[in-house]
Amino acid sequence: MTQAAGGTGFPVPGTGRVTVAVPAPGPGQGRWVGAPSAAADPDGGFVVAYRVRITDQRGAATVVARSADGEGLTTVATLDKGRFGAMSMERPAVVRTPEGRWRLYVCCATPESKHWWIDVLEADEPEGLADAEATTVFGGDEHTGVKDPVIRVADGLWRAWICCHPLDEADEEDRMTTAYAISQDGLDWAWQGTSLAGRPGTWDARGARVTAVLPDGRASYDGRATKEENFSERTGLARLAGPDGALVAEGDGPVADVRYLDVVPLPSGGYRLWYEAPLADGSHELRTELID
């Protein structure tokens, strides 16, 4: 059961014109495309990065695409997990720097482990990310896996919301919270503590993963109540509660049965949304939505 966005005015999936941007890579459980991140391109279009998952390969690759309208995507770079020595890949973050270059933050799974880390690549244009050098910026440690970054830069400050998975209990690594970090350059980061965590006894008790933060502090996150709901998270809303990056959940339940929502505000005042949506056969597709 989902709830309306109430008076927050947050652009909620299912309230605009929906288009399938990238179909599922095949029918059935584990064949997923999604976990998108998007940024506005100076030419009026968008750059979108997303993960492709195939059952026997898990997160097989991160794809970078250009789009003139947000709906039709043209692939300009594909980064295979093998390039990073990763067992899997998950949600990337694509960012245009204040200097006009492009960065791609990719999250990678350590083989034979539940650990994750995050690398960054940089190039003059999105096409150049295919061959750019990778540098680790969030390494995690033996106690924590880090993944699914949400990164924003404004007024000379880089801000990151990072999904953290504790590794202290075997078979319980799906638990998740979101931590907050800041940086002057987007490369050297200082952790600021927990930004958002699940609430005991509620729909997000098992974990809370921030997925989008708007310039005015409105935000969205993925949540779930149980271990069994892993990979079937739903979207909830939150808001910034202060200058330290802390977020407070809004409402008593989810607002959409999708996950990995990203939102780009448009010059016209509307929003372009991208998110990962489940299908009845267990596959997932990447959808986009225009909200005027």
Label each region the model flagged.
Residues 1-292:
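Carbohydrate-active catalytic/glycan-binding domains of CAZyme proteins
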